[in-house]
Amino acid sequence: MEHICKESVAALRDYINSHLPGTIHAVDDQKDIEHPLNYPYTSPCSGHKFREFYYWDTYFTCLGLVHLDRWDMILNNIKNCFDLIDKFGYVPNYNRYHGCNRSQPPFLVNLVDLYYRHTGDLEFLQEGVEHLEKELVFWYNQRSFENGLAHYGYQLRPRAESLAFYEMINRTRVPYPLEDEEEKLQAAYQFYAEAESGWDFNPRFDHKALEYAALDLNCNLYAYEAMLAQFHMLLENPEKASQWQKRAEERKARMNQKMLDKESGLFLDYSVALDQRSSCFSLASYFPLYQGLATQEQAEDAVKALPRFLYPYGLSTCEKAEHSVTYQWDYPNGWPPLQIVVVRGLLRYGYVQEANTAAEAFLTNVIKNFEESGHLWEKYNVVEGSLNVSNEYELPIMLGWAAAAALEMMDVLGL
């Protein structure tokens, strides 16, 4: 890439190689964590901020660990997910009390697939299948509408605790002033569900995440069903493979019926309560490519929509629009995991030039701010190439998925 200096890439890679291992926590480094893990684990940051085990952060961190050849830590992270499923029935948002009344976007099937393709270990795959199926029971029984599509949600907590959660979010994260206590309680439940999406907080659901079939979630669950079909064939269980393939096809059909916007050609979040698709265009529309659900024609429509999101320094989380509230999962913020989803999704469908353009834009942003600050960050302004982002809390120095995105973009660009 003529626009990216090789020396800058080398310096960033050296920084990641030396600092990413600093996010690994030993088993005995959990004395104040209510739900300690049985294996070493990675956290999003080094130091004391965000030092817990976060579900979807862990998946993207593992994509970075691949480039460091740290398969031992990838396996440790997977085993921790297995143990959490055995304990809760799902992988919590994070392993403290306040993170355990919800999950996060489920990516364990992608991790199991990643590790199996590296090792060919059928015993591991069998254990993985058992835990993936157990996790799906949670998503089916506690996070699904009658039409079979899934939504984000929460596990019930004491009334006073939920009211306190509402007050905290309203005061420090997203202004949503209410007077009636029952309305505050219902708002807290919606905030919990939106936190489960990982995109806390965003304009996609209009503060009604419980009412929406979430696009990214249903794409991920489709991947579970489709990959479980493949796994069962590898394990010589053709009958079970057929059952899972049928579930995958049924979900895909429902999504095409309810979530595909004919005008734009994009899949969108779908309000079951209103029986209509969301008017918010976001990078969630690239999950059908990342998880292999889209047809080639649908992928082409997603490529045509890239100008809604692509800026000189990466992909904006949502299309620019006016909102009464400032969200951090919105324009002009570019979040590292979503850059990976879009770029890898484009490559999956053969759009190499478009993937390279997006990868170069975001890597340029990361390098620019690394050279100015000496750090990687949780999110970036993709319009300016700066750290002038919409925040709901102080912008944290980040390794985890920021390092992973940088390494993935380098890999895509052959740097």
Give residue ranges: language-model regions:
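Extended glycan-interaction surfaces of carbohydrate-active proteins
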Residues: 2-52, 76-95, 148-212, 250-334, ...
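Alpha-helical support elements that line or immediately flank enzyme active sites
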Residues: 54-84, 284-295, 339-352
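TPR repeat positional signature
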Residues: 58, 109-112, 218, 222-225, ...
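Aromatic/His-enriched, Gly/Pro-containing loop or helix-boundary segments
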Residues: 86-128, 396
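Inter-helical turn/loop segments and adjacent helix faces that build the functional surface
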Residues: 115-126, 228-243, 349-353
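Short amphipathic alpha-helical coiled-coil/interface segments
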Residues: 132-135, 241-259, 359-362
